[in-house]
Swiss-Prot record:
<comment type="similarity">
    <text>Belongs to the UPF0215 family.</text>
</comment>
<protein>
    <recommendedName>
        <fullName>UPF0215 protein TV0037</fullName>
    </recommendedName>
</protein>
<dbReference type="Pfam" id="PF01949">
    <property type="entry name" value="DUF99"/>
</dbReference>
<dbReference type="InterPro" id="IPR002802">
    <property type="entry name" value="Endo_dU"/>
</dbReference>
Length: 194
């Protein structure tokens, strides 16, 4: 078998046939109207779903700090984390993760997954109406979502530093059942109790 390779870091390509590669999955906790802060949960797991580390970081509701917070999580474990998998692009309301900047800061490929039917244009309209933050709008306008098939389900993805074929293979290998991989499902479950 010839392994699929993603060349993301000099002299450190990822052999996707190895179930031991580690992913950092990230999702946010729910929050109530009027709250200033929320949390993101990061889970480091092997491609086969074996969980090795759980962490959290505080983010500002509708702020601009989520890219930095995720980057800090990833850089603490840069020697082992090979792919960052995000549940969506927006955390803590409209705290938008700039996946291209996240890839630049960490050198780690980023896969941002969301349900079919999610729309950046709807987020842009809401941000224009409520926040008027052109930086967030610029990030959203640069996205190029693609459809991926996972276990017969269509899910959407935005990618940085990784090709769609490699992203699709990682998602399939990290999915135990259903349409979403463990790197999205597990942080979501943990974040719900915060």
């Amino acid at each position: 078998m010839i392994p699929a390779i993603i060349g993301t870091r000099p002299n450190n390509s990822i052999a996707l046939h190895k179930s031991g590669i580690r992913l950092l999955g990230v999702d946010d906790s729910p929050f109530r109207r009027g709250q200033q802060k929320s949390f993101i949960v990061g889970v480091i797991m092997r491609l086969d779903g074996y969980i090795e580390k759980v962490m959290k970081a505080q983010i500002t509701i509708d702020g601009n700090d989520v890219t930095e917070r995720i980057s800090n999580m990833a850089l603490k474990f840069k020697d082992i984390v090979r792919v960052i998998v995000l549940s969506g692009i927006s955390f803590g309301g409209f705290n938008i993760c700039d996946i291209e900047l996240l890839f630049k800061l960490t050198g780690i490929p980023v896969i941002s997954l969301f349900e079919k039917g999610g729309s950046a244009s709807e987020m842009i309209n809401a941000i224009n109406k409520h926040l008027g933050d052109q930086e967030k709008i610029g990030i959203l306008k640069r996205l190029k979502p693609i459809a991926l098939n996972n276990n017969g389900y269509t899910i959407m993805a935005n990618l940085a530093g990784i090709e769609s074929e490699s992203a699709s293979r990682i998602i399939r290998m990290n999915t135990v059942r259903g349409k979403m991989p463990e790197a999205v499902r597990v942080p979501d479950l943990i974040a719900k109790i915060l």
